[in-house]
Amino acid sequence: MKTSVNLAGVELKNPVMTASGTFGSGAEYSEFVDLKELGAVVTKGVANVPWPGNPTPRIAEVYGGMLNAIGLQNPGIDVFCERDIPFLKQFDTKIVVNVCGRTTEDYCEVVERLTSEPVDLLEINISCPNVKEGGIAFGQDPKAVEAITREVKKYAKQPIIMKLSPNVTDITEMARAAEAGGADVLSLINTLTGMKIDIERQKFAIANKTGGM
């Protein structure tokens, strides 16, 4: 049976892909999962510089799932290119790199760096807060969605996946904005914002107060 799919011109052997943030950069799960059986490995988010992530506790169990507020902890693009990409290239699977940033310039720096790397697609995480616009997430403003999509496309060699935030009134508006900016693929969705209160301690269950469900 043919299981291959074409994603923005990239041929995947099957449509099974990992979700960014749940699978590290592949090495962490390679003892438990045969990576070459996957259509693609989608890496944890990588930024232009190392990010330490949020203070602990970062994870809380809730009814029917869990909340997490890792804070996109990552080693930065230099370490990622030197360590993680060579590891993934050992396996016959496509590589999708998730990109995060605090400013448009941060995203573009990572995207430009990846033009010379053997990766297949780039997934742009626009749920990150835009520090130049008061901290509102890029993905919550259609003008910002279109603008950042258009900007990263200027630097990208690989097809661009725009990963949309569900924490908006109308996600179709954001999808149209990404399409207008030149997105090749849309990824729906990033995590839903949630909160858990420890009623015994009368405190938030995670240090960041809110997390992704």
Regions found by a protein language model. Give the residues of each.
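Alpha/beta enzyme core
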Residues: 31, 35, 90, 102-213
